[in-house]
Amino acid sequence: MMQKKKRWREFFGTIAIACLLVFLAKIFVFFPTTVKGASMKPTLQDGDKVIVNKLAKQFESYGREDIIVVKTDNFYVKRVIGLPGDVIEVRNDQLYVNHEVIDEAYLYSNKKQAEKKLMNLTEDFGPITVPKNKIFVMGDNRLISRDSRNGLGLIDKADVLGELAAIYYPFEHMKIIN
């Protein structure tokens, strides 16, 4: 009888520790969220469930081309294009960062769709120098995305919540984000 009580106590103790670890990880390390809207298509779909790494904010480990979640007037999932001091420009549908051509492979399917409509995916703009403590972000679906070009503005580093780590639902979209 004592043996059975001891096993139950160990079992519930293990469950309590596991719950505490999950709770602490959610507070300090990651959080789940849902992608809303089509501004990151085709990389992310409306309704995708994702995990965001909060440590990326603490250590500012996100960089150009990483996908981040920011909180301004709302929550936004966007791609980092420019960091403080970077010079950002788009000419003839080509992104330049610090006067170097950037190959945005994640835009190929969107560029093909824009070409079929005889449109540029991204309007010309810049050059823009990203100020200290700000970042420049854009959505992958440039035709409809509200981002640093058109209404969202430059993002305060303090408004970054974290970097996208994984898509966990729907299962056919499941993947780790590099």
Please give the residue ranges for each predicted region:
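Soluble "head" domains of membrane/secretory-pathway proteins
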Residues: 2-8, 20, 24, 42, ...
